[in-house]
Amino acid sequence: MAEASERLYRVQYAKSGRASCKKCSESIPKDSLRMAIMVQSPMFDGKVPHWYHFSCFWKVGQSIRHPDVEVDGFSELRWDDQQKVKKTAEAGGVAGKGQDGSGGKAEKTLGDFAAEYAKSNRSMCKGCLEKIEKGQMRLSKKMVDPEKPQLGMIDRWYHPTCFVKKRDELGFRPEYSASQLKGFSLLSAEDKEALKKQLPAIKNEGKRKGDEVDGTDEVAKKKSRKETDKYSKLEKALKAQNELIWNIKDELKKACSTNDLKELLIFNQQQVPSGESAILDRVADGMAFGALLPCKECSGQLVFKSDAYYCTGDVTAWTKCMVKTQNPSRKEWVTPKEFREISYLKKLKVKKQDRIFPPESSAPITVHWPLSVTSAPTAVNSSAPADKPLSNMKILTLGKLSQNKDEAKAVIEKLGGKLTGSANKASLCISIKKEVEKMNKKMEEVKEANIRVVSEDFLQDVSASTKSLQDLLSAHSLSPWGAEVKAEPGEVVAPRGKSAAPSKKSKGCFKEEGVNKSEKRMKLTLKGGAAVDPDSGLEHSAHVLEKGGKVFSATLGLVDIVKGTNSYYKLQLLEDDKESRYWIFRSWGRLGTVIGSNKLEQMPSKEEAVEQFMKLYEEKTGNAWHSKNFTKYPKKFYPLEIDYGQDEEAVKKLTVKPGTKSKLPKPVQELVGMIFDVDSMKKALVEYEIDLQKMPLGKLSRRQIQAAYSILSEVQQPVSQGSSESQILDLSNRFYTLIPHDFGMKKPPLLNNADSVQAKVEMLDNLLDIEVAYSLLRGGSDDSSKDPIDVNYEKLKTDIKVVDRDSEEAEVIRKYVKNTHATTHNAYDLEVIDIFKIEREGESQRYKPFRQLHNRRLLWHGSRTTNFAGILSQGLRIAPPEAPVTGYMFGKGIYFADMVSKSANYCHTSQGDPIGLIMLGEVALGNMYELKHASHISKLPKGKHSVKGLGKTTPDPSASITLEGVEVPLGTGIPSGVNDTALLYNEYIVYDIAQVNLKYLLKLKFNFKTSLW
């Protein structure tokens, strides 16, 4: 596997004669100069070099301006070859006759820039994001698409005027001209002339003598001469140093065997690397400058790489050391007595010196592989303008929508998209629920192409909502299938899927990933203790072996933020259902992408299969299969506790469309169906970038979620104290390994600020509640005589009664909703659909001691619909001890509000999903500890029973009413008189679950005010 590098290019002397040139297909001779483009491998989570002869490299259109910055391995070349690379780069990639050793004439055309007439009207200008019409002249620059780096260098098209505006940014140098564009000769005479005027070669004319003013130019010249002299001296020193190192290498190659060199490294307490050239480099470095002492931070081995010495050790089992220095500590290099017989080593005397480094280039380092330092979910179409969120997308409409086709087309085009009639070309499908349920031929094509289906309301929300496009797609999704929606990159259509591995038939780069069969969501076939991976092709004829109570199936994860890896490895031992036949199946790749592969290997016997399984497991994790206590080792995988249990069928039975057997009132039936909606649970996880392929709903263990909480607790200290990057890296790597995330080709973001920690705390809170809901669905009786709705209702252990709309209590509650809607929460109005009176089993008894406490109020608590199965069955809970206290404004407690809209905001509804649930609970507040700013409370002051966060607005206290000793603050909002507070509205927090008695559950419709029409 290739070594990870942020640089797109690599140069070195060929280590063997086995590699062939990607341009001419001829072999590259050993020790000859070769150059490579680093390309994402389609087979594993890493990059591989595509090697070229030196001259061929420039012919395929590579434009390098600063080889010392852009090319990995440049400084390790011989001095003459460094100059050769520099001069060729300066000449715009023209190697010149005879320069490549083959004597071939180099091409003068710029291979990475092209001009042509658009072959269709499908491409989009990367400058203005407008369509390029068929037959219109267009210019391109070959670049790596950060979302699909496995495609390598692809054309990115521009209108000529847009290209001219971005000339410098695109690397079209001043000395380049239009006539050097590939395809220029095929343009019409008129277009050639126009393009020559737009893209002329710009000559840098020197100043005339008469330009000098008051001697200032003379001062500048003297300064320039000084800098030139200084640079010239440094160049000479670097050249002498380079020649010294290469002289040592050349002599060592003649005088010593590879084993001799290894012995020299071991004697000087240096690690022995793999590969002859690496061993030679390390010995030469030690002889020239001294033996390197271990890293002070981790005791690892320091190694020279281009611009510094980097530590190759590990701070912890999860994270590599980040130490980098140009002045490492050294000791004298010692040659053992037995080696002094070698004449060269006997004569060699090197004066102790420090390694000289070239000055840091002022050229910006272009990072070609996508980086991410934010924890917020990335917009699906991040390149799109704010007013055109559907730019580069093709939309298919199916079924009878509220608008006719022309109206829908107008709206879609207004948002930057295009209407299409083909499922294979579509990025997204807009339809209605009935069409998905009906599953006609056209919808089957949509499913086959793995295109996500969303409701028509999505078009309204996408222009009005502040949520990311991914969140809106999740909220409006109608289909259980669907790859992540991506904008179309010009003419290369390659939406990213979420399959564990590509089809065995797929070879090389993916031309059209969207139609890859393996991209469809995996259907896991459960047999006995685990699910057989469908990529094995044996899901219907074999099962996972279970022996001694242990299931021979393992899902492993490895995250390294520095390298940008987010890898999985799956291992299964499969046994034939009928015969004594055994297979080892393994799959590997990058989470959330089609990058990866798999292997099915038939074994001669059960014993050999078990032995091979255990060998592979130990190779990947460093742990024996039967070891009870797992130890994480550096660069090794970590097992995920994913439960592929036998309860899936029970879930399916209880989520089927309810029949007519239910004796519950219709509103209660609808409420229970809403609470246990599995699709809503999946949508919630997708919003948090959870990878549902590697962590199917309900499959991650509670223990692993709690371990993730503990990591976030550890993160809060280094984040608040500004600790070392290594510590934050370590904790981030551990977190993302425990909770598999889908980041596509982006690097996993560091958990390096309070907001990112807060977002992940919220994610784990929801994961826990979803885990409760799913556990309820899986557990309990399998009584086929009962309606599924009734079975699920019983699991809530809550008496739910519909409140008569005309009753006095319903009137009071509606008034409370109307009066306490805050003026700043003006994006929607709230409409009460149903009011339910609830009584949780055992809660009244638990609350009994607090009934005598003064200051009891009826307050609001809002949450996602997916959390209500957990809330009703287990009550409102305080975050677990493992959760970080900084994830909550006033510490870990249960939060309430007296303004309905403050709590309603936590329902996370949208125009496409406007129904939310909110609760009213009787809360025993007693003596309140009043605060104006965040305070991470872990223990209340003596004599206090709760915290009140003071807001600038409060319900009018004169309008409050009292029902059975409980205050209902249903007055309209008025200024509270508290101005120096961080809160707009009041918050109430209790730290004992027994202080809460849930009374009512409201089903609300959020009537959003913003619309496209």
From Swiss-Prot:
The modification ADP-ribosylserine is found at S499, S503, S506, S518. Residues 494-503 have a biased composition (Low complexity). Residues 290-332 are annotated as: Zinc ribbon. ADP-ribosyltransferase activity is regulated via an allosteric activation mechanism. In absence of activation signal, PARP1 is autoinhibited by the PARP alpha-helical domain (also named HD region), which prevents effective NAD(+)-binding. Activity is highly stimulated by signals, such as DNA strand breaks. Binding to damaged DNA unfolds the PARP alpha-helical domain, relieving autoinhibition. Zn(2+) 1 binds at C21, C24, H53, C56. Disruption phenotype: Mice show a complete lack of nuclear poly-ADP-ribosylation. Mice are however viable and fertile. Moreover, repair of UV and MNNG induced DNA damage are not affected. However, about 30% of the mutant mice developed pathological skin aberrations on a mixed 129/Sv x C57B1/6 genetic background. Mice lacking both Parp1 and Parp2 are not viable and die at the onset of gastrulation. Female mice lacking both Parp1 and Parp2 in the uterus display infertility; defects are caused by decidualization failure and pregnancy loss. Changing K498A: Does not affect mono-ADP-ribosylation by SIRT6. The modification PolyADP-ribosyl glutamic acid is found at E407, E413, E435, E437, E444, E445, E448, E456, E484, E488, E491, E512, E513, E519. Residues 200-226, 489-508 are annotated as: Disordered. The modification N6-(ADP-ribosyl)lysine is found at K520. Its EC number is 2.4.2.30, 2.4.2.-. Belongs to the ARTD/PARP family. This is Poly [ADP-ribose] polymerase 1. It comes from Mus musculus. The lineage of its organism: Eukaryota, Metazoa, Chordata, Craniata, Vertebrata.
